[in-house]
């Protein structure tokens, strides 16, 4: 029983109120990622960079621009060695992530049975119908963005796309690395090597295209993020950012703090003000509610700027 309780404490989903951080007694931050989650992310993106640096010159080794890179990294053998080592680390990171998710599911099975999509918000679920509202907003048929939750559409798409991509590029990478094992011991036809090469290469092009053209703009290069969203490093987001981008999550966190730790509202009057605002704004129709929340976020930002300049 002691081991089980220790296991549950280690992998238990954080309560909503635990995501709110009070900095210097006057500033609210929201914690999105734990240290371990950030390390997993660093492992994936750092090895991905090395995969690109070494993989594309190998694919286009006859093209002039690739030759200096190949020479710099020890020729074809050197490039292949670095590519394989970084690929092995990347695939290990992926497997560790899968194990981590399984352990979280086991430790929170009671919550999963109660409300799977409510607690495991990274999984696409019924609330993702808000994506339709997002399209309407982009096309001008809606005045405000959707009432996004903790994970918006791009978070979920990128998270699960990495899973599919790692299966596709990882398995084919192993086949290309150890062709004699797969065609010899496992008895796969020789054509498997050519098919694996095409899948491995095309998946790499697809991954780089999506990350360079879509993901980087939405997550890092957008006007409100440029030059970078540092949440991958700090794990936290500002209150203003959370109100604007994930209003449903913000309201739920504030209400959870008020309901589960009411003493904090007495200790920090600004928290009580936030709670009263949330209660009032939730009485409004959705679009008007989102508009009021954005206005409130701008008000908080103006106060913060005045405080810094004053």
Language-model features, listed with the residues they occupy:
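Membrane-embedded alpha-helical bundles that constitute the cytochrome b-like, heme-associated redox core
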Residues: 1-310
């Amino acid at each position: 029983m002691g081991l089980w309780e220790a296991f549950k404490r280690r992998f238990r989903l954080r309560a909503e109120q635990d995501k709110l951080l009070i900095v210097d007694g006057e500033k609210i931050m929201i914690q999105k990622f734990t240290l371990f989650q950030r390390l997993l992310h660093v492992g994936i993106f750092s090895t991905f960079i090395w995969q690109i640096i070494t993989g594309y010159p190998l694919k286009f080794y006859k093209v002039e621009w690739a030759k200096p890179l190949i020479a710099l990294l020890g020729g074809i053998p050197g490039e292949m060695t670095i590519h394989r080592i970084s690929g092995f680390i990347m695939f290990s990171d992926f497997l560790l992530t899968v194990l981590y998710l399984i352990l979280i599911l086991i430790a929170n099975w009671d919550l999963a049975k109660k409300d799977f999509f409510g607690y495991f918000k990274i999984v696409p679920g019924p609330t993702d119908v808000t994506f339709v509202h997002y399209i309407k907003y982009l096309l001008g048929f809606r005045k405000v963005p959707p009432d996004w939750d903790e994970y918006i559409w791009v978070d979920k798409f990128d998270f699960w796309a990495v899973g599919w991509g790692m299966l596709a590029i990882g398995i084919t990478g192993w086949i290309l690395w150890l062709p004699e094992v797969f065609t010899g011991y496992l008895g796969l036809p020789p054509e498997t090597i050519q098919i694996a090469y095409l899948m491995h290469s095309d998946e790499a092009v697809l991954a780089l295209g999506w990350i360079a053209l879509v993901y980087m703009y939405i997550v890092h290069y957008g006007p409100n993020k440029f030059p970078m969203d540092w949440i991958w490093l700090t794990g936290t987001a500002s209150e203003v950012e959370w109100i604007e981008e994930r209003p449903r999550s913000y309201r739920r966190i504030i209400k959870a703090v008020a309901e589960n730790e009411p003493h904090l509202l007495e200790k920090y009057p600004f928290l009580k003000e936030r709670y009263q605002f949330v209660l009032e704004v939730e009485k409004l129709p959705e679009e008007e509610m989102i508009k009021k929340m954005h206005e409130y976020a701008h008000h908080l930002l103006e106060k913060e700027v005045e405080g810094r300049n004053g």
